[in-house]
Swiss-Prot record:
Its main location: cytoplasm. This is Adenine phosphoribosyltransferase. GO terms for biological process: adenine salvage; AMP salvage; purine ribonucleoside salvage. The gene is apt. Keywords: Cytoplasm, Glycosyltransferase, Purine salvage, Transferase. It comes from Mycobacterium tuberculosis (strain ATCC 25618 / H37Rv). It catalyses: AMP + diphosphate = 5-phospho-alpha-D-ribose 1-diphosphate + adenine. Catalyzes a salvage reaction resulting in the formation of AMP, that is energically less costly than de novo synthesis. SUPFAM superfamilies: PRTase-like.
Length: 212
């Protein structure tokens, strides 16, 4: 039994050392570099691995595609570590459908807390709590389960990939508060500063890793 515990602690320590090899106080080391060499910020990593797609999903919208970022093991790990730092103190993480699921689950694992999936309308079995909202390219609905998951009284941080107008995170906040949760803040990978989403969510604390 002692050997099993010792092995578990050793693996955990090795995992921590692996993270520290490339993440150090918000800085990310390039592949193959030592900690003594120059590093780049998490924001720079996000920017370098974000793809701009014009006229998607509708004409006139420039879509920020974070798929290359999430597919890069160092990029994903750096983003996870940085978001987990900003979500510290939460006892539940809420991830927004769909790309928010990727980072929310990773952050929840890092913090050793649970993750709540905030789904698009019609994806969850009833009963549900629903909230309609408006985004840059039309109306939409978000839902969470009304039964089976206790959110009342829990300190929740909302995690998503992109903050644009604030409609999605605002609807998520209203859903969680209707369920009795204490929404402590929101953390996103990319904030589109020109769309005033942060102002729309005030006074909710909002943390972003990159402002584009």
């Amino acid at each position: 039994m002692l050997n099993v515990i010792a092995t578990g602690l050793s693996l955990k320590a090795r995992g921590k050392r692996r993270r520290q090899r490339w993440v150090d106080d918000g800085r990310v080391l390039a592949l193959g570099e030592s900690r003594r060499s120059s590093a780049i910020s998490v924001a720079d990593v996000v920017a370098s691995l974000t793809r701009d797609v014009a006229d998607f999903p509708v004409p006139g919208v420039e879509f920020k595609d974070l798929t290359p970022l999430f597919a890069d093991r160092r990029g994903l790990a750096a983003v996870t570590e940085a978001l987990a730092d900003r979500a510290s103190g939460a006892d539940l993480v809420a991830g927004v459908d769909a790309r928010g699921f990727l980072v929310a689950a990773a952050v929840a694992t890092r913090l050793e807390v649970g993750v709540l999936a905030v789904r698009k309308g019609g994806k969850l079995p009833r009963p549900v709590l629903s909230e309609e909202y408006y985004r840059a390219y039309g109306a939409a609905t978000l839902e969470i389960l009304a039964e089976g998951i206790e959110v009342a009284g829990r300190r929740v941080v909302i995690i998503d990939d992109v903050l644009a107008t604030g409609g999605t995170i605002g609807a998520t906040r209203r859903l969680l508060e209707r369920g009795g949760a204490n929404v402590a803040g929101a953390a996103v990978v990319v904030e589109l500063a020109g769309l005033s989403g942060r102002a729309a969510l005030a006074p909710l604390p909002v943390h972003s890793l990159s402002r584009l």
